[in-house]
Amino acid sequence: MDNNSQNIDKLKQEFIANASHELKTPVTSIQLAVETAITALENSELEDTRKFLNQILIDSQRMTLLLSDLLDLSQLEVNDPIKELVNLKNIVEAEIRFLPEENKNRVNFESVDIDFLIDPDDFSMIVRNLLRNACNYSEKNKKIDVNLFFDNSDVVLTILDRGRGISKADQERIFERFYRVDKGRSRALGGTGIGLSIVKHAVERNNGNIQVKSNLGEGSEFIVKFFNT
């Protein structure tokens, strides 16, 4: 087996381990929280019950994000894109509305109405993962700028965060499946290391490309371009 194959196998093993851990941890936490909440209800400890129910909600959200990544990846690998003429501005606005309230208020979105031939599920997937990435890797009080515009007949989507930035070495690998820039932080956020590879796959199969511009300490800008050919 060559080095490249060994590296891929190692990354796959890491992903399986990470995914298993991320699924097992919230399930265990949910079970414990439910048991404790039941006991607290029996003892009329309402404040404790509120805290445990909140933990159930958080862990359920983590599981949902992980399963969403796995389902997105499966969809991209199994199904061919089904392109439709859709309004891209409406799709971006919908994905912003789906964000948690504290993140929704951080996003500045500017766009004209753009009708474009693309797989709408793929485009939603792209926007959703890039928004999640920007929210996760920037401070909670920092704004995120999202722009959607025409470049002649092509379409460009940019998402700019003001986070910690990405090193030049990591920029060369961030779109690789299973690769994580900061494994410790990704685990704390419930990440699996496949979000940006999902984005790249979805972009390229819709006749587009993606690049990142970033300096450490200065945030990151992801630039997606779809070609009208």
Predicted regions and their residues:
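Short alpha-helical segment of the dimerization/phosphotransfer core of two-component systems
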Residues: 58-63
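Conserved micro-motifs of the catalytic ATP-binding
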Residues: 77-82, 115-118
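A conserved beta-strand-to-alpha-helix junction within the catalytic ATP-binding
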Residues: 82-97, 149
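Short helix-loop "hinge" at the ATP-lid/N-box region of the Bergerat-fold HATPase_c
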Residues: 134-135
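Short conserved segment of the HATPase_c
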Residues: 166-178
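Conserved glycine-rich
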Residues: 207-208
